[in-house]
Amino acid sequence: MNVLITGAGGFMGAYLAQLAESAGHSVLGIDTKEPETGTYTGAFDLCDVRDAVRIYETIAAFRPQRIFHLAAQSYPTVSMTHPFDTMQTNAGGTINLFEGARAAGINPIVVVACSSAEYGMVAAEDLPVREEHALRPLHPYGVSKVAQDLLAYQYFANYGIPTVRIRIFNTTGPRKRDDVCSDFTKRAVQIELGIRRSPMIVGNLTTRRAIIDVRDMVRGLWIAADHATYGEVYNVGSSNIYSGAELVEAIRPLIKVPFTLEQDPALLRTCDEPVIAGDTTKFRLCSGWKPEIELSTTISDMVEWWRNHLAPAAALSNSWARADEHQVVA
C-alpha cells in the first residue's frame, strides 16, 4: 500500500513513517525540510503543502491509498506574529492536498492531524473536553486548525473522500523540541553535563496538560485509518494530566546533579489554556486503542536522548574550560 505522509520531516511524521515502513508499506514523506539524520529511512521529497502544483504532481505520481496530513505551522506563539503564514499553511495546505487527490482521480483514506487548540478556553466542569464541545480557539494557530478540521469534513460531505479527523492532544517523546517536556529535559541535562548552570529556567508551572507519548499517538493515527468512521472527528491523547511542576519533579531524580528553578517572565504566554485534556472515549470504543507508555518511561527516554544529543557540545565546553584553566595556571 502506498502511504503519503505530509510533514514527514517533523517530529511526529518521522515516527509515523517508521511505523508504516515496519508494516511493509511503501512510504513517501514530504516536507519543507530534510528529516533529521537517523530519524527517517523512506522515500522523501522536499515539497511545501502551500505549493499546489507540486502537491498535485506528487499525488498524481505516487497515487497513495492512504494520506496522513501532518504538515503544519504548529506553534501558537509563532501564529501570533505570523497569522497569515499560519493560515496559508494549515488551511491552504489542506485545500491543496484534497484538491490534489480529486485532480488525480483517486479516493484515498485521509487522516488529518487536527488539534486540541481548537477548543480554546474550556470551563473546568467541561473537562475532559468532548468532541461536540464548542470551538473557541485563543490564537491564530487554533483558528487555522478549526479551518483545517472543517475543510476536511466538507471534502468528505461533498465529495465522499474517506476522511478521519484526529484532534491531537499534547504529544511528546524523544527528539521532540520546543514543548514543555522537551524544554525541561533539555535544560536539566544541560545542567548535568555542565553546558549551563543551575537554576533551570522555567515558565508557567501551574498549567496542566494531558501528555501522551508520540509512539502511542502515531499508533493511534494508524489505527484510525482502519477503524474510525469516515467523516467523524476524534480526540486522541492521554487521560493522565500533569502540571509543569509535576514534570519537573519527574525529571529531577533522573539528573545526576541537583538544580534549582527560576521563572522567566518572558516564557509566560498571554493566551495559555489553564488545562488541556480531552475525553478519548469515542476513539477508544471504535478502535480498541489505548496509550501503553507511562510518562516515567517517556521522560526517561527523553533524558537519555538529550544526553546523547548534547554530549558533543558538553565535550567541547569542557575542553574549553580546561584550556582556560591551563592558561590561568600558566
Residue ranges and their predicted role:
Residues 199-204, 233-234, 243-249, 256-275, ...:
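C-terminal "lid/loop" region of Rossmann-like NAD(P)-dependent oxidoreductases
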